[in-house]
């Protein structure tokens, strides 16, 4: 408060008062005065003035100290309530962490499993996947646990890392398995839904699953919103802590300044008492003064006394006239000051009238633009939400397509099995052809050889076995035909899937066009915001120009400058508030646009990959169709060959019948024995072939059964998990609906409270305007009372002077000489130390030397403004008028 420079000022004053007070005086006007008494009186008056100033500063410091104490008590009360709420929040947070741990134990299966044991985010190839872990760490460190250790008087120290670690572990147990489970459940649900028959129950199950997924997404969004609100509250609390620390530091600084001011005041009081005692001692001694003429002659003394009395009367008249002029001038200045105070009060009321500000054209224009921009932002947000919904639908359909492709692999396996069986049949046919050729050769040899009866019997047995083999081959051919029909159905299904994929590609292109339109709209909104900022800058420039155009007096200019500064501050606050809101909305829109563009890019990449996969699947399908055609042609060729063999067999059978008729009678016994051996051999070979084929078929069927059993078990497990998940989601949805209704009721209450607060704000503003008018009236009355008090004091001083002059006339000559000496001393004090003619009218506040106004104005006109007594530099603001 400027207390450090007071001793220097006292030293300068004590060193500079002597030359100013001891300046030479004209002998024609006044007598010489001792410099020591003048210096002492100047020191006394200056110290008295300083003492008064310091007492005023001390009172102001005391008032500020009381206000700060009240404020500090209020802050302590707020801190106490805040500590209570914070302790409650900490307890609830610990309870939440415990609940999370219990839920994580339930999800992991055993309480001994740690979060890092099952979810360490390490892949099979050794690479880490730290995305979810980083997200969890940011959630725990910045948002959730930020309010758990921010008490001003307590620091957690070593307790904070275990709390963070436990929270991170609990959240890891909740989130990391849930993400894997969600992904696995989605895949299983898609597989189960695609395999369900198309009836009312399956459609109802699909609708309920989609509703549950949407409610789950809403719950996740609500959790993210709660985390953001928690983070904002933690930031607000940190700001309150910083402000309270700053206020405590200011409180300590003001205490120190108050103590220093009190010590300085005591020092000045001590010096003032010493100077008073010294003055009382000096006033008791008489000071001889020279007189004009001869001292020994009494007539000269009488004449001198009369002349001095006349001079005293003349000076008294001059002083009375000067006092009357000064009083008139003071009255005029007082009236001007009252008028200025009235104008300032009216200007303050105009500036703080919020209704007039709201009704202004500029405010209405800015408000309309803000409403338009808000509507456009809402429109763009709806467009972005629609794009997000379309993208989610596309992802869902793409997953369905992938599931259908996976299901299409099963007919491919069946076709490969059919091809392997066809190859086996070809081998069997080839063996039969070879056996046929061998039989023909044996028949020819038997016809040539004498033991043809045995050959004939063998041939009969073979002929009897050929029809059975032909029936088996025909059954296998029918099976192959059925497999070819299934392949045609699979082709039709692949064709339908390709058409669905092309349709989805067209939908994706339309979505990209919509996103491009949304980006152009966002750029237009940004240009509108830049125009608003430019108009705000122009308005500020107009305000500055209007500020510079004023040509009134200095005091009016200062008041207008203060008015314009307050007005600019109000507008700056409003514009900063509006711009911050706009910037937040634009940032949110830009972030949403960037997210949609990223998602669109990923969707396009996935579409390109699916297109490539579809192309490869089409190529594979074409190659398989060509292979099937070739196999069908080979089957037709085999069929023709079998028919040819049958016809040849019929011809041979006719010939054999003729031959048999010739040799039946001779070779009956031999044929019976040979037929029995051939039958036994044929049955043995047939049994071997049947056992081999049955074993091979049994192995293939067992492998297929194992595969289907595994799929059935996995689907049953997934169905159980999904049923449990559906129950949990239904419970969560019910809880969320209850909480949503509660939040809606709270929102309605908040809106009602806001309306009441606005109404109370209008009433308070009206009361503030009336109170300002009352304060202005009180200030005017106070100025009037001060002026009247000053007039009374001046009148009292004049009357005291008159009484002293009357007493001086009635006293003896010694008293008259003493009065004359005192009058001369006062003249020396009142007259200027430069011109020694005019009265002292102004004071330099840096060194407290008194001079007349004209001499000081001359020194102010110079480039180097220095005090004539102590050569201390000063400015125009350091010169203050005084009334003596």
Curated annotation (Swiss-Prot):
Keywords: Chromatin regulator, Coiled coil, Flowering, Metal-binding, Nucleus, Transferase, Ubl conjugation pathway, Zinc, Zinc-finger
GO cellular component: HULC complex; nucleus
Binding partners and assembly: Interacts with SKIPA. Interacts with HUB2.
Enzyme class name: transferase
Main location per the UniProt record: nucleus
Compositionally biased intervals (Low complexity): 108-121
Recorded coiled-coil stretches: 49-86, 216-541, 580-663, 696-762, 789-827
Enzyme Commission code: 2.3.2.27
Annotated domain remarks: The RING-type zinc finger domain mediates binding to an E2 ubiquitin-conjugating enzyme.
Biological role stated in the UniProt entry: E3 ubiquitin-protein ligase that monoubiquitinates H2B to form H2BK143ub1. It thereby plays a central role in histone code and gene regulation. H2B monoubiquitination (H2BK143ub1), mediated by HUB1, modulates transcriptional regulation of anther development, likely by promoting histone H3K4 dimethylation (H3K4me2) in the chromatin of the key tapetum degradation-related genes C4, CP1 and UDT1.
Stated family: Belongs to the BRE1 family.
Pfam families xrefs: zf-C3HC4_2
Protein name per its UniProtKB record: E3 ubiquitin-protein ligase BRE1-like 1
Catalyses which reaction(s): S-ubiquitinyl-[E2 ubiquitin-conjugating enzyme]-L-cysteine + [acceptor protein]-L-lysine = [E2 ubiquitin-conjugating enzyme]-L-cysteine + N(6)-ubiquitinyl-[acceptor protein]-L-lysine
PANTHER family tied to this protein: E3 UBIQUITIN-PROTEIN LIGASE BRE1 (PTHR23163:SF0), RING FINGER PROTEIN-RELATED (PTHR23163)
UniProt-recorded Gene Ontology molecular function terms: protein homodimerization activity; ubiquitin protein ligase activity; zinc ion binding
Stretches for region Disordered: 1-37, 107-127
Record localization: Nucleus
């Amino acid at each position: 408060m400027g207390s450090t420079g007071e001793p220097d000022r006292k030293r300068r004053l004590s060193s500079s008062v002597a030359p100013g007070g001891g300046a030479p005086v004209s002998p024609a006007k006044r007598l010489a005065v001792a410099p020591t008494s003048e210096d002492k009186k100047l020191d006394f008056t200056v110290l008295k003035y300083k003492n008064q100033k310091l007492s005023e500063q001390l009172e102001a410091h005391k008032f500020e100290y009381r206000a700060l104490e009240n404020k500090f008590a209020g802050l302590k009360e707020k801190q106490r309530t805040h500590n209570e709420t914070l302790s409650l929040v900490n307890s609830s947070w610990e309870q939440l962490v415990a609940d999370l741990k219990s839920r994580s134990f339930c999800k992991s299966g055993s309480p001994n499993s740690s979060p890092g044991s099952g979810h360490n985010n390490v892949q099979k190839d050794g690479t880490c996947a730290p995305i979810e872990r980083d997200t969890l760490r940011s959630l725990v460190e910045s948002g959730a646990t930020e309010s758990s250790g921010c008490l001003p008087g307590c620091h957690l120290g070593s307790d904070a890392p275990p709390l963070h670690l436990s929270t991170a572990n609990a959240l890891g147990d909740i989130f990391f398995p849930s993400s894997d489970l969600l992904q696995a459940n989605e895949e299983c649900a898609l597989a189960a839904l695609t395999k369900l028959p198309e009836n009312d129950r399956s459609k109802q199950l699909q609708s309920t699953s989609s509703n549950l997924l949407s409610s789950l997404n809403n719950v996740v969004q609500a959790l993210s919103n709660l985390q953001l609100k928690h983070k904002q509250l933690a930031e607000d609390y940190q700001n309150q802590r910083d402000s309270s620390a700053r206020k405590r530091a200011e409180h300590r600084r003001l205490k120190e300044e108050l103590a220093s001011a009190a010590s300085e005041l005591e020092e000045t009081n001590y010096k003032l008492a010493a100077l008073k005692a010294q003055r009382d001692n000096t006033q008791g001694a008489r000071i001889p003064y020279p007189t004009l003429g001869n001292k020994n002659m009494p007539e000269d003394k009488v004449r001198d006394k009369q002349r001095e009395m006349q001079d005293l009367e003349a000076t008294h008249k001059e002083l009375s006239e000067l006092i009357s002029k000064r009083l008139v001038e003071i009255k005029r200045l007082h009236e001007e000051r009252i008028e200025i105070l009235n104008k300032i009060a009216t200007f303050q009321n105009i500036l703080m009238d919020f209704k007039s500000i709201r009704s202004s054209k500029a405010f209405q224009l800015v408000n309309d633009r803000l409403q338009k921009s808000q509507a456009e932002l809402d429109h763009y947000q709806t467009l972005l939400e629609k794009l997000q919904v379309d993208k989610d639908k596309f992802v869902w359909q793409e997953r369905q397509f992938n599931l259908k492709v996976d299901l299409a692999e099963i007919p491919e396996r069946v076709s490969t099995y059919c091809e392997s069986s066809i190859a086996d049949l070809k081998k069997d046919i080839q063996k039969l052809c070879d056996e046929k050729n061998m039989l023909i050769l044996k028949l020819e040899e038997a016809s040539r050889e004498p033991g043809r009866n045995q050959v004939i019997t063998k041939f009969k047995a073979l002929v009897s076995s050929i029809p059975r083999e032909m029936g088996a081959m025909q059954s296998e051919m029918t099976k192959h035909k059925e497999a070819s029909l299934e392949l045609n159905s699979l082709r039709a299904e692949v064709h339908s899937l390709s058409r669905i994929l092309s349709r989805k590609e067209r939908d994706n292109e339309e979505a990209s066009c919509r996103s491009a339109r949304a980006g152009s709209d966002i750029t237009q909104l940004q240009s509108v915001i830049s125009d608003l900022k430019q108009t705000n800058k122009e308005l500020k420039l107009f305000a500055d120009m209007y500020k510079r155009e004023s040509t009134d007096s200095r005091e009016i200019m200062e008041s207008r400058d203060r008015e314009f500064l307050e007005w600019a501050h109000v507008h700056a606050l409003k514009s900063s508030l509006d711009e911050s809101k706009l910037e937040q909305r634009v940032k949110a829109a830009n972030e949403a646009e960037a997210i949609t563009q990223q998602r669109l890019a990923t969707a396009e990449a996935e579409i390109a990959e699916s297109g490539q996969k579809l192309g490869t699947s089409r190529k594979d399908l074409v190659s398989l169709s060509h292979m099937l055609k070739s196999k069908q042609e080979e089957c037709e060729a085999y069929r023709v060959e079998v028919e040819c063999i049958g016809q040849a067999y019929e011809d041979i059978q006719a010939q054999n019948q003729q031959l048999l008729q010739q040799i039946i009678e001779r070779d009956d016994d031999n044929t019976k024995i040979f037929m029995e051996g051939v039958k036994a051999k044929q049955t043995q070979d047939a049994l071997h072939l049947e056992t081999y084929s049955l074993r091979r078929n049994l192995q293939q069927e067992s492998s297929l059964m194992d595969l289907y059993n595994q799929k059935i078990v996995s689907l049953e497990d997934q169905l159980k998990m999904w049923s449990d998940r559906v129950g949990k989601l239904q419970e969560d949805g019910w809880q969320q609906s209850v909480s949503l209704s509660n939040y809606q009721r709270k929102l309605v209450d908040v809106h009602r409270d806001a309306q009441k607060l606005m109404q109370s704000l209008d009433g308070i503003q009206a009361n503030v305007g009336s109170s300002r008018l009352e304060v202005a009236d009180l200030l005017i009355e106070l100025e009037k009372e001060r002026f009247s008090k000053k007039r009374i004091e001046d009148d009292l001083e004049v009357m005291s002077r008159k009484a002293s002059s009357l007493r001086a006339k009635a006293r003896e000559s010694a008293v008259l000489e003493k009065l004359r000496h005192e009058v001369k001393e006062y003249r020396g004090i009142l007259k200027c130390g430069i011109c020694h003619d005019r009265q002292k009218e102004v004071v330099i506040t840096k060194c407290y030397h008194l001079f007349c106004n004209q001499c000081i104005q001359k020194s102010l006109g110079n480039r180097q403004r220095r005090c004539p007594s102590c050569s201390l530099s000063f400015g125009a603001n350091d010169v203050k008028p005084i009334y003596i």
